Curated annotation (Swiss-Prot):
The keyword tRNA processing does not apply. Residues 1-461 are annotated as: Alpha N-terminal domain (alpha-NTD). It catalyses: RNA(n) + a ribonucleoside 5'-triphosphate = RNA(n+1) + diphosphate. The keyword Transcription applies. GO terms for cellular component: chloroplast; DNA-directed RNA polymerase complex; mitochondrion. This is DNA-directed RNA polymerase subunit alpha. It holds the Pfam family RNA_pol_A_bac. In plastids the minimal PEP RNA polymerase catalytic core is composed of four subunits: alpha, beta, beta', and beta''. When a (nuclear-encoded) sigma factor is associated with the core the holoenzyme is formed, which can initiate transcription. DNA-dependent RNA polymerase catalyzes the transcription of DNA into RNA using the four ribonucleoside triphosphates as substrates. InterPro entries: DNA-dir_RNA_pol_insert, DNA-dir_RNA_pol_RpoA/D/Rpb3, DNA-dir_RpoA, RBP11-like, RNAP_asu_C, RNApol_insert_sf. Keywords: Chloroplast, DNA-directed RNA polymerase, Nucleotidyltransferase, Plastid, Transcription, Transferase.
Length: 577
């Protein structure tokens, strides 16, 4: 029996000790909960990318006290839709069109359709842009123009590189410049707007700055057939086509009429064409056409041999025709005149070969347009693009750009009970973006915009003569006093020499502004402020006309309120009557 009692007492002690330990730990937790502040957490519930221009995110924000969740959710929603900056195309210059309903030759879409497609392009940048930027587009067909063909600054890029712009045929050519700006919400143009004329002059002055000396296909599509017009700056002005000892010299006086300035001669041969593939610029420094020939490529050599055979047949036909009629030429015609005709025919055959010589193979080879001769047009490099400046129309088309990166925002308020059985609210926030920003980053930026909006309200002082009780602002009081003194001297005194000469007039003019201030600028507490207002004391001038006894006679205005009013007046160097 003794052993059983000991075991029971021992078990009772162990249970009691365990209970006390739990109680102490619960007290510690409760104390910690009282000391520790409550945190608002943002967690992602769901997110998905529907396509490159549609991001979706679902977030939980909270906990909040009852009533606070609705305030935060509504403020966040409005901030997301109106305060976030975006980048977009705002103004376009198009060569070859004067109005938006015109259609350029070789372009499937009208100018209006192209502008609408440019409006839908979503741009983003590595940082916020504070000044307008310029972009370029200069392409010729056949091919499809997409967002990746736009020549943009290095820090700006398209969210969806495959976004459609236009389609060009064989004879199609599209040249344009456009202005890129950063803003909020959206923009609508007014013809008399000064900002529109500033952007228009900026767009007219801008010129493309291209350092590359080789042709470029579309960046995003290897199989694209669009080449960009790139001006080349070479040191060598000599005109050499293919170099070899066995060459046939072709005089090209008629090429001068076409705008092709050949400085020396045009040389053509077989061996260097197939073996060395040594190709230099066919045109001089001021008028060059950007296309290259690449060596050691099997597919390219196959197309080269086919081209060479066709070209050789044309040459043999010309030779036979020349030898057959040589005697007739010498007898019946002037030799110089006959020579010009043959040269014209030769240059014409070279410049406008058969269509099959221009056929591009459907291959993944990025150099599939090598060895294909291109017709050179007269180039006016005083203009921004490779078009004849005199015969080309220029149109300027503003775009009602949409800068908002947020497409849609929804929120839902849910109430839950925490561990202490207290009701807490949480916000379920749904955000859809256009792909230029992640939904979570958008919420952070929207919250930051709200903080920057409300932060000045903590520091605002309608009366700069007052000194705040907060120690954080005491250091800036000396600067405030200096500003006030400078304001007295510069704004009031130097403006009128008569005021500066008369000190009484000086003081009277400056103090008059202070006396007209409302007593709310004294930052009194609620009790003295309400008593003074009920006594019809509205301005500081009314207040200093009272004595201490008069103020103490006001109902509910005691000694403590009097001391508070006197301290507030001392800060403004004023006293009661």
């Amino acid at each position: 029996m003794i052993k059983i009692i000991i075991k029971e007492t021992f078990s009772f002690k162990s249970v009691l000790m365990h209970f006390l330990k739990e109680k102490v730990s619960n007290n510690k937790i409760s104390k910690k909960n009282k000391i520790m502040p409550s945190y608002t957490l943002l967690s992602c519930i769901d997110s998905r990318v529907e396509n490159l221009t549609k991001f979706y995110g679902r977030f939980e924000l909270g906990p909040f006290a009852p009533g606070q969740a609705l305030t935060v959710a509504n403020a966040l929603r409005r901030s997301l839709l109106s305060q976030l900056p975006g980048t977009s195309i705002t103004l376009v210059e198009v060569r070859g069109a004067s109005n938006e309903y015109e259609i350029i030759t070789g372009v499937r879409e009208s100018i209006l359709d192209i502008l609408l497609n440019l409006k839908q392009i979503v741009l983003t940048s590595d940082f916020e842009i504070f000044s307008p930027q310029i972009g370029f587009l200069s392409v010729e067909g056949p091919g499809v123009i997409r967002a990746n063909d736009l020549k943009l600054p290095s820090f700006i890029y398209a969210v969806d590189p495959n976004q459609y712009i236009a389609t060009l045929s064989n004879s199609g050519r599209l040249n344009m410049k456009f202005l890129i700006c950063c803003g909020k919400n959206y923009i609508t143009y007014n013809p008399n707007d000064s900002q529109y004329f500033e952007w228009l002059s900026l767009l007219k002055k801008s010129k493309p700055l291209i350092k590359s000396n080789s042709p470029k296909l579309n960046k995003g599509n290897i199989n694209s057939e669009i080449d960009s017009d790139i001006s080349i700056d070479k040191k060598n002005d000599e005109v050499i086509f293919f170099q070899n000892a066995n060459t046939r010299v072709v005089d090209s006086q008629t090429a001068l009429k076409k705008g092709l300035v050949l400085k020396n001669t045009l040389r053509i041969n077989k061996s260097s064409f197939l073996i060395n593939s040594n190709y230099q610029s066919f045109f001089p420094k001021t008028q060059q056409k950007a296309f290259s020939i690449f060596r050691k490529n099997s597919k390219t050599f196959l197309s080269t041999m086919g081209f060479y055979k066709e070209w050789k047949k044309e040459r043999e036909f010309l030779k036979k025709d020349l030898y057959k009629n040589q005697e007739d030429f010498n007898k019946s015609y002037d030799f110089q005149e006959t020579k010009k005709k043959l040269q014209t025919k030769l240059i014409k055959n070279f410049e406008t070969p058969k269509k099959k010589l221009f056929k591009v193979q459907n291959s993944a080879n990025p150099f599939n347009k090598a060895f294909i001769p291109l017709t050179e047009e007269k180039v006016d490099y005083d203009s921004d693009f490779n078009l004849d400046h005199k015969s080309t129309k220029i149109g300027y088309f503003p775009i009602d750009a949409i800068f908002m990166p947020i497409n849609r925002v929804n929120y839902l308020i849910e109430s839950t009970e925490d561990i202490k059985l207290k009701i807490k609210d949480r916000v379920i926030l749904e955000v859809w973006t256009n792909g230029s920003i992640h939904p979570r980053h958008a919420i952070h930026k929207a919250a930051k915009a709200l903080i920057q909006l409300f932060l000045p309200l903590q520091q605002i002082r309608t009366n700069l003569f007052l000194i705040s009780d907060n120690s954080h602002f005491e250091e800036g009081q000396d600067k405030i006093k200096k500003r006030i003194d400078n304001f007295k001297k510069e704004a009031l005194l130097k403006a009128n020499p008569q005021i500066q000469a008369n000190p009484q007039l000086k003081k009277r003019n400056f103090d008059h502004r202070l006396l007209e201030l409302d007593i709310a600028n004294l930052e009194l507490t609620a009790r003295p402020y309400s008593c003074l207002k009920l006594a019809n004391i509205n301005t500081i001038e009314d207040l200093i006309s009272y004595s201490q006894e008069d103020l103490l006679s006001i109902k509910n205005f005691g000694r403590r309120s009097l001391i508070e009013v006197q301290k507030a007046l001392q800060l403004m160097k004023l006293t009661l009557k």
